[in-house]
């Protein structure tokens, strides 16, 4: 047996971690779990050579503080506080399983497949850890002697590897530095297509001033900026949009956004939301429908979005706060302004709105009852429920 003083763990990539200690940042977003870089590779000493061990990794909160990035520095947030809910610790068993102590001490123990996410829907895999943005985390290595079951487990917090999960690098130099060693590390740079929303105390301050309903929809870090695809033609404002969304959905309409993405706006006065964007939003936040059958998708979406007054522009008095689950074909009569004004056209939109380029085949709303409520010539409804057709918005 060995004492705790004999047992020691060091990071194989310690020099890289030290370059940004204690303010390393890791990108997380809604596109899927992200690899941790620098990698979590360890060297262990002080084991019994003939005993067999298992090695486990956990990603745990460093403390119970909610942080903010302000004036170029990380520090405790002055606006929002961490939740009191205790973290559920998850352990990931090293894929090699059990090994002799002498084997473990000769090699570098690599956890290079470990990923992190800020979306619980990706938590079905053993190597994926859930983290919250604006909190600090630290990897913890646990070594268990299974030959001598009475031997105590040995755990060590790797202080040098503490990090902040973020949706975009606050310290852009981190992204530039990572890109030199890891080809997939540039996503979070603002200049490389990353989310333009800063994780700052000042942004939290703006969020805290919103109404309750607005805050529920404008959940931080759940969405990403709608961007044009490689097929976008600037001269004609045409081309397929990627199925992405904006994290600043509560700030629309935005003059700067219109100038940057003129093809994204059929008209200045129309709520700038896309049909497929609604899908991702409610998939992620409310989960109010069966993703396989897609039943009640439209009704549920309308029910939630009808409670958000800023989307209606100057028609707040016409918003229906609790739209029930009526069949979709009844919406024009039952809720002339509480439903369709939030949806952009998809029915024969290749002729009407070529810059959206949605088709019947890829539309989530393809059931006949919903299609029948639209016409090929009119794709929008005014406050009285009358179908109208708005002109395109152009930057010219």
UniProtKB/Swiss-Prot annotation:
Chief localization class?
Answer: nucleus
Where along the sequence lies the DNA-binding region?
Answer: 11-192
- InterPro entries, alphabetically? p53-like_TF_DNA-bd_sf (IPR008967), T-box_DNA-bd (IPR046360), T-box_sf (IPR036960), TF_T-box (IPR001699), TF_T-box_CS (IPR018186)
Origin: domain of life? Eukaryota
Cell compartment(s), UniProt: Nucleus
What PROSITE patterns does the record tag this protein with? TBOX_2 (PS01264), TBOX_3 (PS50252)
Keywords attached to this entry: DNA-binding, Nucleus, Transcription, Transcription regulation
Q: What GO molecular functions are on record for this protein?
A: DNA-binding transcription factor activity, RNA polymerase II-specific; RNA polymerase II cis-regulatory region sequence-specific DNA binding
Task: Give the start-end ranges of region Disordered.
Answer: 185-215
Per the UniProt entry, what are the Gene Ontology biological process annotations, in alphabetical order?
cell fate specification; positive regulation of DNA-templated transcription; regulation of transcription by RNA polymerase II
* SMART domains to which the protein is assigned, alphabetical: TBOX
Q: Where is the composition biased (Basic and acidic residues)?
A: 193-215
Give one Pfam family: T-box
GO CC annotations, alphabetized: chromatin; nucleus
Q: Which PANTHER family match?
A: T-BOX PROTEIN 30_42-RELATED (PTHR11267:SF196), T-BOX PROTEIN-RELATED (PTHR11267)
What is this protein identified as? Putative T-box protein 39
């Amino acid at each position: 047996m060995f004492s705790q003083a004999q047992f020691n763990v060091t990071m194989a990539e310690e020099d890289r971690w030290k370059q940004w200690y204690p303010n390393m940042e890791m990108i997380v977003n809604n596109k899927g779990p992200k690899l941790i870089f620098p990698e979590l590779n360890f060297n262990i000493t002080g084991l019994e050579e003939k005993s067999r061990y298992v090695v486990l990794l956990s990603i745990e909160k460093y403390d119970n503080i909610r942080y903010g990035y302000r004036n170029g520095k990380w520090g405790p947030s002055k606006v929002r506080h961490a939740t009191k809910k205790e973290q559920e610790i998850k352990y990931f068993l090293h894929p090699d399983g059990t090994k002799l102590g002498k084997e473990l001490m000769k090699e570098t123990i690599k956890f290079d497949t470990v990923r992190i996410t800020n979306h619980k829907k990706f938590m079905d895999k053993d190597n994926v850890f859930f983290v919250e943005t604006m909190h600090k985390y630290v990897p913890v290595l646990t070594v268990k002697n299974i030959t001598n079951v009475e031997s105590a487990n040995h755990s060590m917090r790797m202080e040098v590897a503490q990090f902040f999960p973020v949706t975009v690098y606050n310290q852009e130099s981190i992204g530039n530095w990572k890109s030199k060693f890891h080809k997939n590390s540039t996503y979070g740079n603002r200049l490389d297509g990353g989310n333009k929303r800063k994780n700052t105390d000042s942004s939290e301050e703006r969020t805290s001033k919103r109404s309750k309903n607005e805050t529920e929809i404008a959940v931080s870090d759940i969405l990403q900026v709608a961007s044009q695809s490689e097929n976008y033609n600037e001269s004609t404002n045409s081309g397929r949009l990627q199925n992405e969304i904006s994290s600043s959905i509560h700030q629309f309409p935005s003059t700067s956004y219109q100038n940057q993405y003129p093809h994204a706006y059929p008209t200045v006065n129309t709520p700038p939301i896309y049909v497929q964007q609604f899908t991702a939003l409610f998939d992620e936040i409310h989960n109010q429908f069966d993703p396989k059958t897609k039943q009640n998708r439209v009704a549920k979406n309308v029910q939630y979005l009808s409670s958000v007054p800023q989307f209606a522009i100057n028609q707040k008095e016409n918003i229906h706060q609790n739209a029930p689950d009526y069949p979709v074909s009844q919406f024009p009569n039952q809720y002339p302004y509480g439903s369709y004004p939030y949806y952009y056209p998809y029915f024969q939109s290749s002729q009407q709105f070529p810059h959206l380029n949605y088709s019947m085949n890829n539309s989530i709303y393809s059931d006949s009852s919903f299609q029948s409520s639209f016409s090929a010539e009119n794709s929008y409804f005014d406050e009285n429920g009358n179908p109208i057709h708005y002109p395109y918005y152009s930057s010219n």
